[in-house]
Amino acid sequence: MTFCPRFSRRVSECESIIAYEFNSKSLCAQALNTAADSMSVCVLDGSIKKIPKNDRLAVYGDAAAAAYLCSLWIKGGLPKPDSQDCWTTLRRDLISNDNLTRVGREHGLDKCINMNGGTTRVSSGMVATALEAILGAVEIDGGRDALARVMKHLGLTEHALLGSVKFFPLDNLTHLICIGAFSAAMEFPRRPRPVIPGFA
C-alpha cells in the first residue's frame, strides 16, 4: 500500500512512538487526520482518496480506552466504599483530555497530526482527539490486547490506585462488564419529557 509522503511519514512516526505497527496504514492515517480540506487528500495505491477526519475514531477510542481501564479497576479489587470515587479518579487522571494532551505532546504525537492548510498550531484539543483516535484505531486493527499494550506503553495505565499494572488481556466477560459500567457512568444530556394531555 503506497501513501503520499505526507501521510506516510506521519504514520511511520506514530507507529514508532506507540510501538505498534498497523496492518491497515489507512486506519492510522485517519486517526492522525484533522483536516477536511485538500490536505486530507492523498494518493492510495494509485488512486486519489480523501482521508476521513478522526472525530468518529476518537469517540470509539475513548470508549475502548475506558473499557480497558475499567477492567484494571475491576481486577484490582478496590474497596467497595471507595470504588466509585476510585473509578472517577482513574478516568480523570489517565484518560481525561488534559492528560491525553500531556501524554500526546510528551511522546511527540502532536508532530504526527495532519491539519488543514493554513493551520500552523496544533491545539490541545487536536492532540487529545488524535490520541483517542489512535487508541481506537489500534483496537480496531489489532484487538483488545493490542490496545492494552499501547496504553501501557504510553503510561495510560500507570496510577497509584492501580499499583504496578502488568499486562492484562481482556476476557470476554470482563470486557462486557466494563462496557456496561462505562455506559452507565456516561452522562448524556436529557431532554425534557413531552407533556401529553391526559397523562402525568
Question: Where are the regions a protein language model picked out?
Answer:
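Double-stranded RNA-binding/processing signature
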Residues: 1-200
